[in-house]
């Protein structure tokens, strides 16, 4: 690698729409829509703050709007019912998640989409110092 190159080159590839479905139902009321050619992507940029719990807080994520358009096109979604607004656990739930992406033009080559997820879980230790966990949920 080279220190002069960006290892996290997340190009937008003229992405125009992002939809997330949970168990067949669309997650947000309307999809994230972008138009990078006309610099209309602030809603998608704001998703980074809402999806990481930084929205309406006096802290940033180190990315500017120009960074977002120029190679840091990351999208974040909080799929918890309470938007991770509390120190409690949510009810266990199993289901399906579907990500629909719409591009303004056909892609010239295959691209990779990276999906990163965080899950709540409870680790317990008993008096014999055995660790009990359940990662299947």
Identify the meaning behind each predicted range:
Residues 1-137:
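Flexible assembly/topogenesis modules
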